[in-house]
Each structure stands twice: as structure tokens, then as C-alpha cells.
Amino acid sequence: MGDAVKIGLRFRERIWERSDNLNMSFLFSQDDVVPTWFVGFPMRTPIITGWAAGPKSVQLLGKSEQEVAVAAVGALARVLGLESGFVMDRLEAVHYHDWHADPWSRGAYSFVHAGGIDIQRWLGKPVEETLYFAGEATEWTGNCGTVHGAIASGVRVGRAIAGPGRLG
């Protein structure tokens, strides 16, 4: 499993549209604790999601939601060129889940090491054609670590259970 931190921030207004970012989907800053930001463009909600994976996420693991919120607001303010106080004043809600500390996941996503594609096939192999496994970690067609991979593996298992030609 790879570590990742995902932080949802809801604001009173879409503060990222105050500059030339009106039609932005992603913002990226290599040097910050939360380097990646994305919105649900073309939907124009006042919600932005921060994403830190790998070594960047380690700086946030085990922190309280308040500590993560302060770090995230600071990172977002820097990437937008705004004052942290301005951003914090417009913040209405924060959602943060510590996937690393979650006893049911103990991480956030899978990734394949070089030469490791066979492990995904092994993880997705049914046991005596009665117990089937799905999930992005069992997806070997190039979409591991993604929602797309989770869905594709679910379709694969559904087809295997239903039998040939039953699910299209």
C-alpha cells in the first residue's frame, strides 16, 4: 500500500477563481506539503480537494484534522498566491480521513513496483472458483490505484461469477 492524504475543503466561495484560474481543474506545486489540488470542474462547487501522496503524505500522517487543515490551507494559499488568513476566513468545512491509521485499510492505494504486475494477477485470482477478489489492487490492465481500476475489477469479477456472456 502507498500512503496518501486527501483533504476536502469547502469554502463560502470559489476562492481559486479570483485570479486566472477560472476554468482550472488541477493546481500543482512541487515544493509544498499538499502539492496537488483539484476541483470538480466543470461543476462549480466551492469545494477543492488536496492530495499528498508518498513522501509528501508522511508529513501529515498521524496529525489531527485541525493540524492537517492548517497545513492544507497554508499550501492552498501559497499555490494561489493568497494570504493564509484570507483563505482561512472563507473556509466553512474540512473533511480529512487518516487512511494510514484506519484499521480496515492501513493505507490509501496500491501501486506496482517494477516487475510486480504478476502480484496483482495473483491477488485477483479466485479461490476454487467460489471466493472472488476485486478492488484496484487486483487490477492488472493498467488502472491500479484508481477508482477506474476498482470498477474494472468489479466488472471482471461480476462476469466471472455470472458466467460467459451473461454481463455483456
What is each residue range found by the language model?
Residues M1-K6, F11:
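Flavin (primarily FAD) cofactor-binding/catalytic cores of flavoenzymes
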Residues D3, E17-G168:
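Conserved flavin/dinucleotide-binding core of flavoenzymes
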Residues L9, E13-S19:
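Rossmann-like dinucleotide/flavin-binding elements
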